[in-house]
UniProtKB/Swiss-Prot annotation:
Keywords: Cytoplasm, Decarboxylase, Lyase, Porphyrin biosynthesis. It comes from Synechococcus elongatus (strain ATCC 33912 / PCC 7942 / FACHB-805). Coiled coil: none annotated. SUPFAM superfamilies: UROD/MetE-like. The keyword Protein transport does not apply. It catalyses: uroporphyrinogen III + 4 H(+) = coproporphyrinogen III + 4 CO2. Catalyzes the decarboxylation of four acetate groups of uroporphyrinogen-III to yield coproporphyrinogen-III. NCBIfam families: hemE. Substrate binds at R28, Q29, A30, G31, R32, F47, D78, Y155, S210, H325. GO terms for molecular function: uroporphyrinogen decarboxylase activity. This is Uroporphyrinogen decarboxylase.
Length: 354
């Protein structure tokens, strides 16, 4: 057992230690709000080139670490990255987002989805994660991530981002057997992919079921929860010590169900008060979040006050400070810096405010 004080703060929080301040990182902390990222994007305009070339992905992952020293450094990648390795091709078009052609809508297409071999299909993952671990040492935890089965199925079936999810719901409610077959294959492949990330150096992994908030509770229980559980059970069987985070956008209606997924930490969006989230999830599930990314357009005093309010509600145990969603493009970089500086000084700020 490694001495606790030498472990990254984020791991200590995930294990339930009482800390003087919560660890902090931001979803999409490497991205368009940073000038260094925009400069690199101008030079390498293809998203897949940036995320699948080790040197570029390492550099991008480390940009916010060098600038702000967050307690977590997340792999720069995309939830769709492993899909081609299962026989589901995609591309990301600047300003349009992901395109998956042809969309998957028949039993024959689902039957053609095959097992993922991450070393072969995503060979860039190992050098990226190994290098990130070397670069950050114990100063931060390295996070891996993947998309959850429902959300990946939604992309594959819609063929692109959607506001209505009409195609996947059509399949769910008229031919559920086909959808369940796809969800099962995705769950097993995502478990393989997350275990591979852990083998390569990820110390914490987050499952993004970004679109599961679009489901009614009864449909969440049918199409989302069982497959989240299937992923987490397989990862826990191989890596019982690795903290698992589940994030859903618009999750207020299914919060308790998220706690049944097998995750250790529920990442909460800003529509739920953290005191309420604690009450609804119980003492054994950690919380991550949950500041509205729009707060970072406010004054620095406003940002500080919101951070203090959030941390007081969360308490000093099993909480990772984060936004409730990814940081927005156009966010002033100085305000992101202020967010991290405030978070890193919370022990003094909390003491001074009592």
């Amino acid at each position: 057992m490694v001495a606790s004080s030498s472990l990254p703060r984020l791991l200590r929080a995930a294990r339930g230690e009482v800390l003087d301040r919560p660890p902090v990182w931001m979803m999409r902390q490497a991205g368009r709000y940073m000038k260094v990222y925009r400069d690199l994007r101008d030079k390498y305009p293809g998203f897949r080139e940036r995320s699948e070339t080790p040197e570029l992905a390492i550099e991008i992952s480390l940009q916010p670490f060098r600038a702000f020293k967050p307690d977590g450094v997340i792999l720069f990648s995309d939830i769709l990255t492993p899909l081609p390795g299962m026989g589901i091709p995609f591309d990301i078009i600047e300003s349009k987002g992901p395109i998956l052609e042809p969309p998957i809508r028949t039993a024959e297409q689902v039957a053609a989805v095959h097992d993922l071999d991450p070393e072969e299909a995503t060979p860039f993952i190992r050098p990226i994660l190994e290098t990130l671990r070397q670069e950050v040492g114990n100063e931060a935890a390295v996070l891996g991530f993947a998309g959850a089965p429902w959300t990946l199925a939604a992309y594959a079936i819609e063929g692109k981002s959607s506001k209505t999810y009409a195609n996947i719901k059509h399949l769910a409610f008229s031919e559920p057997t086909i959808l369940h077959e796809l969800l099962g294959k995705l769950a097993d492949n995502i478990a393989i992919y997350l275990c591979h990330q852990i083998d390569c150096g990820a110390q914490v992994v987050q499952l993004f079921d970004s679109w599961a908030g679009q489901l009614s509770p009864i449909d969440y229980d049918t199409f989302a929860l069982p497959y989240q559980q299937r992923v987490f059970q397989q990862v826990k069987a191989k890596h019982p010590e690795v903290p698992l985070i589940l994030y859903i956008s618009g999750s207020a209606g299914v919060l308790e169900r998220m706690g049944q997924s097998g995750c250790d930490i529920v990442s909460v969006d800003w529509t739920v008060d953290l005191l309420d989230a604690r009450r609804r999830l119980g003492p054994d599930i950690g919380l991550q979040g949950n500041i509205d990314p729009g707060v970072l357009f406010g004054s620095q005093d406003f940002i500080r006050d919101r951070i203090l309010d959030t941390v007081r509600k969360a308490g000093n145990q099993r909480h990772i400070l984060n936004l409730g969603h990814g940081i927005l493009p156009g966010t002033p970089e100085d305000n992101a810096r202020h967010f991290f500086e405030t978070a890193k000084n919370l022990d003094q700020l909390l003491a001074a405010s009592h």
